[in-house]
């Protein structure tokens, strides 16, 4: 019979640190979250390399068999959102709007078109993150379109 003892030290964590640890993603820190970084590692990339070669990285994520649909779609939603946010000052307005819409598209697919229903992952942090990507991306895209046309759509 083995006997042992363990000591545990408990320390307080600030609200900011807690949120960063639990929620650290493109919306809260400006960097990709751990789930997306893990997905990138499956395709042999990292955040910096992926953003430098966005098209190749995106294609690798879309076509890999090493990720399930939820991992792939949530990572793509976050990547497109990062692309849109990083391009605020350098991207053409239409390209930035397109990036927000791509983020919303992948987030919607994650939320409603994967094998598990939203209720089956209701308490998962990743679903909350992806839902926020969807809401934020749609809001930004609509705001940009409205500002671009000031309520007057382009003629066909």
Positions of PLM-derived features:
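N-terminal alpha-helical interaction modules that lie
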Residues: 6-88, 94-141, 149
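C-terminal motif of bacterial Sec signal peptides marking the signal peptidase cleavage site
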Residues: 2-4
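Long, low-hydrophobicity ectodomains and other hydrophilic envelope-associated domains
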Residues: 147-156
